[in-house]
């Protein structure tokens, strides 16, 4: 350390300090640093860069493949959505058609049932009218017979004489009933 102080006191430079610049290293340091840098650069260029390029290319291919797969999946999904929408529209149209057919069939069944009910009602009314007419005829016939008998008895009492002849009896009954019909028509 005394040597350093001696050199500094005399104003001389230290033995390892030949160069005047503080920022620039010694020339031999620059040369050897360049040699090592070139060797490292060559090694990097020969071994690291191709692997790095291969990894980048592979990654680029994977990204492109992923994009293509995504586009294909998106196109497939879009096609599936369009197919689904088409099937949905078809199903809705079919449902509307079935609904309309059911309405038409329901109206047809309703009309048939109304027609059958009307027909049955008319048949029942007609049957009732026929039955009523038959009963009316039966009642009229019974009334004529009874009235005929009653009129004969009444006529015999009034005349005091007995009508023995069936022809006379029948004629008298018919005449009486004809007069009765002209005065008041039967059943009306």
Curated annotation (Swiss-Prot):
Location(s), subcellular: Cell membrane
Database matches in InterPro entries: ATP_synth_B-like_membr_sf, ATP_synth_b/b'su_bac/chlpt, ATP_synth_F0_bsu_bac, ATP_synthase_B_chain
Record bears the keyword Cell membrane: yes
Keywords on record: ATP synthesis, Cell membrane, CF(0), Hydrogen ion transport, Ion transport, Membrane, Transmembrane, Transmembrane helix, Transport
GO cellular component terms, semicolon-separated: plasma membrane; proton-transporting ATP synthase complex
SUPFAM superfamilies named among the record's database cross-references: F1F0 ATP synthase subunit B, membrane domain
The organism's place on the tree of life at top rank: Bacteria
Mode of membrane association: Single-pass membrane protein
Transmembrane is among the record's keywords: yes
TM stretches of this protein: 24-44
GO MF terms held by the record: proton-transporting ATP synthase activity, rotational mechanism; proton-transporting ATPase activity, rotational mechanism
Subunit structure: F-type ATPases have 2 components, F(1) - the catalytic core - and F(0) - the membrane proton channel. F(1) has five subunits: alpha(3), beta(3), gamma(1), delta(1), epsilon(1). F(0) has three main subunits: a(1), b(2) and c(10-14). The alpha and beta chains form an alternating ring which encloses part of the gamma chain. F(1) is attached to F(0) by a central stalk formed by the gamma and epsilon chains, while a peripheral stalk is formed by the delta and b chains.
Role description: F(1)F(0) ATP synthase produces ATP from ADP in the presence of a proton or sodium gradient. F-type ATPases consist of two structural domains, F(1) containing the extramembraneous catalytic core and F(0) containing the membrane proton channel, linked together by a central stalk and a peripheral stalk. During catalysis, ATP synthesis in the catalytic domain of F(1) is coupled via a rotary mechanism of the central stalk subunits to proton translocation. Component of the F(0) channel, it forms part of the peripheral stalk, linking F(1) to F(0).
Assigned protein family: Belongs to the ATPase B chain family.
Name of this protein: ATP synthase subunit b
Organism: Corynebacterium diphtheriae (strain ATCC 700971 / NCTC 13129 / Biotype gravis)
Lineage summary: Bacteria, Bacillati, Actinomycetota, Actinomycetes, Mycobacteriales
């Amino acid at each position: 350390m005394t040597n350093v102080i001696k050199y500094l006191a005399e104003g001389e430079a230290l033995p390892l300090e030949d160069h005047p610049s503080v920022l620039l290293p010694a020339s031999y340091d620059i040369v050897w640093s360049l040699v090592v840098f070139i060797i490292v650069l060559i090694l990097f260029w020969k071994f690291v860069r191709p692997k790095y390029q291969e990894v980048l290319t592979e990654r680029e291919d994977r990204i492109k493949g992923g994009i293509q797969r995504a586009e294909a999946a998106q196109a497939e999904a879009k096609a599936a959505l369009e197919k689904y929408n088409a099937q949905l529209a078809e199903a809705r149209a079919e449902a509307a058609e079935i609904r309309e057919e059911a309405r038409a069939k329901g109206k047809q069944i309703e009309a048939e049932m109304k027609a059958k009910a009307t027909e049955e009602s008319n048949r029942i009314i007609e049957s009732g009218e026929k039955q009523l007419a038959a009963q009316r005829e039966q009642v009229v016939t019974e009334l004529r017979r009874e009235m005929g008998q009653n009129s004969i008895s009444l006529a015999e009492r009034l005349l005091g004489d007995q009508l023995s002849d069936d022809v006379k009896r029948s004629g008298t009954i018919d005449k009486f009933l004809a007069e009765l019909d002209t005065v008041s028509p039967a059943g009306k």
